């Protein structure tokens, strides 16, 4: 589930807080009376279709619950959600990003800790790094479904260039210099010369060696591994401009401006998504979130995954939004049932498919029990290429810290000022 930078407009909604009083569990309904709950979410075309089919299965299993689905593009999501809240039409259940914690402080959403017992859940069921808390005792819940930053690539581009595939084990990870060298070999001009060739034409490139997302999730694993941070050591100032962090950002800029192995921001904005760019051989590698795996599976691309090019102090994180339940709901039990359905990797065949393609589980047992790992991460599955368990599952589980957007208060507002787009 991809999150985008979204403008936070909650201050204007403070006067609306009175609209949202804590709602007890829905009154007992007659067995034939149908409850309708509204669920707002975002996602690509493939994710939208998957959610629609998943919710259809939920309604088949729960015939007394009707789910009103509202798909909102991620870039418009918070604006639309704020408007719904202001109009007294908040959804019952919703996707959310880092702004959810402000909603928690404003009393708009349930403290998930208060719902655990009712849903038969325990905090210990979940990875410890994945809780969206706005205070030590108040939480918007665990991540709904994990994603992580990863290196994706087109296998055919590597084979055609005679270049070894990216390593899948942390102990064999490329150094940054090795990564740049590989990217040069994979960057081709219209005459077929690579970026290491002295006659390479940087003004006429047909295949880039690497592209990368421009949000925080791409550069932060490298900054954390280098000993830098999003905030400074005093935790009251920005750390991205300290020496270690600045060098990492410079490294990414050099891919564009010095080595010409990655497109400029203007060029990238005119190019397609990660899956399409890889499938079309517009780029040989792409560093971004694992949410791209579903689209890659459907793209027809011969693709693979590798560990990030970090050869010392490998540090990364799981991340993702959480499903939030609004206090204004008149159907708490129905909302809890939908929550449990969407977050249980084994609730239905369609949900299982989501956790085998688009999402990754957040429950600890799916990273520690070999049978549970194979259930969703078997490399026989079409969205789990060879090396997936080492490069994605093990590398992230063994080296995860709390994701920056979960760990930094007011992250949404800060990140809007730092968004390198």
Predicted regions and their residues:
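Mature extracytoplasmic/periplasmic domains
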Residues: 57, 294, 321-409
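Short, solvent-exposed loop/beta-turn-alpha elements that line the ligand-binding surface or hinge
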Residues: 113-126, 168-172, 200-209, 228-248, ...
């Amino acid at each position: 589930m991809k999150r985008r930078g979204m403008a936070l407009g909650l201050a204007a909604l403070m006067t609306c807080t009175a609209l949202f009083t804590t709602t007890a569990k829905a009154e007992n309904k007659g067995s034939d009376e149908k409850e309708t709950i509204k669920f707002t979410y975002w996602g690509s075309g493939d994710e939208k279709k998957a959610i629609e089919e998943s919710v259809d299965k939920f309604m088949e299993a729960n015939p007394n619950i009707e789910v009103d689905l509202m798909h909102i593009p991620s870039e418009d999501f918070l604006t639309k959600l704020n408007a719904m809240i202001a109009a007294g039409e908040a959804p019952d259940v919703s996707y959310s990003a880092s702004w959810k914690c402000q909603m928690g402080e404003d009393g708009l959403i349930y403290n998930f800790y208060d719902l655990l017992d009712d849903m038969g859940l325990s905090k210990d069921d979940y990875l410890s790094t994945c809780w969206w808390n706005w205070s030590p005792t108040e939480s918007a819940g665990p991540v709904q479904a994990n994603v992580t930053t990863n290196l994706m690539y087109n296998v055919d581009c590597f084979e055609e260039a005679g270049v070894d595939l990216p390593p899948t084990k942390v102990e064999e990870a490329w150094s940054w210099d090795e990564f740049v060298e590989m990217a040069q070999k994979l960057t081709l001009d219209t005459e077929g010369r690579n970026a290491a060739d002295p006659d390479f034409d940087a003004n006429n490139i047909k295949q880039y060696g690497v592209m990368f997302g421009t949000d925080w999730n791409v550069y932060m694993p490298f900054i954390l591994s280098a000993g830098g941070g999003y905030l400074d050591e005093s935790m009251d100032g920005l750390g991205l401009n300290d020496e270690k962090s600045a060098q990492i950002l410079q490294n990414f800029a050099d891919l564009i401006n010095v080595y010409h192995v990655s497109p400029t921001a203007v060029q990238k904005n005119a190019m397609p998504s990660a899956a399409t760019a890889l499938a079309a051989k517009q780029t040989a590698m792409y560093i971004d979130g694992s949410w791209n795996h579903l689209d890659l599976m459907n793209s027809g691309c011969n693709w693979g995954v590798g560990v990030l090019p970090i050869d010392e102090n490998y540090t990364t994180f799981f991340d993702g939004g959480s499903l939030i339940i609004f206090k204004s709901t008149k159907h708490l039990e129905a909302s809890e049932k939908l929550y449990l359905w969407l977050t249980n990797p084994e609730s239905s065949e369609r949900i299982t498919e989501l956790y085998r393609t688009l999402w990754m589980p957040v429950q600890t047992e799916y990273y520690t029990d070999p049978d549970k790992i194979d259930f969703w991460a078997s490399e026989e599955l079409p969205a789990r290429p060879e090396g997936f368990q080492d490069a994605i599952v093990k590398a992230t589980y063994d080296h995860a810290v709390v994701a920056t957007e979960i760990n930094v208060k007011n992250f949404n507002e800060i990140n809007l000022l730092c968004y390198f787009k």
